């Protein structure tokens, strides 16, 4: 319940282990979509990896295979373009390399930003962002599966004067820095007061 990165690391080395690997997870599983992304890409490259049940994963001893592969753009990075669109009076932004049906859990950003007035129009390996006037009066969301998006939405909602309550943020404290503390400190410089309660802001 600390970070899915440790799980992904073990999964990715498992195909080259002589007996493969079976992982049994305990406690609350955070960032599950990131684990699913790891499994999907492993299978794309010839591994045999899957969930056995809600808490157990199994990887067979089978080496990876080299295949042609199109690397999708990063939905986490795309969140900042969504933010720019949301904070603009008018916006039409084209982001290449993003798919409507994506392995990435952070592709959820399109659905959440729709609540903040940003429409996502999908084309051939691209998405176009357009500003609309359909904006929620308040935003409540559990980021347990997309923690890396939380900072973008905290800043966006604050600058748009939209009240919010976000939960599922416990993993943000053990990133490259304590992102919660940094967020509270930096937003305070702009005059915003954020309240941290357990895993919520």
How should each PLM-predicted stretch be described?
Residues 1-201:
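Short, structured segments at the rim of ligand-binding sites
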